[in-house]
Amino acid sequence: GISDGAGLRIVQLYDGIAAAALRDVLSGVRRVFTYNGSRFDLPFIRERLRLDVQAMAEHHDLMFACWRRGLYGGLKAVERALGLRRQMPDVDGLEAVRLWYRYKTRNDAAALARLLAYNREDVAQLEYIRRRLVGPAGSPQF
């Protein structure tokens, strides 16, 4: 998701994503926020796409900011601790992998749609957590 402070624009890249497409999406982005991204997302992108996101934008892993505030666990655990609810509470990381597999092996459009909806919700929740930890306008105080 890309937030300009006024709103959140969600861009989803999948299935044969090219480094150029991600580079275009990140063009002009100053800061990138992830949850456990320093351990998963960024190394995955660096390995698969040969793209160093941290060289393009300042990266903040909200997992560590959560830890400093006594919020431990995965993204869903932090959401629960903050009282956030999900529209898709039955979908978790394992189910996301299963949905991707169904899409890739059976060309299951419904599985892909559900996965993309789950990912959109992840991004929106992450933005909410970022705002709770950082505030709406200011620079992060990590």
Feature roles, as predicted:
Residues 2-85:
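Conserved DEDDh/DEDDy metal-dependent 3′-5′ exonuclease domain
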Residues 79-142:
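Acidic, Mg2+-coordinating catalytic module of metal-dependent nucleases/exonucleases
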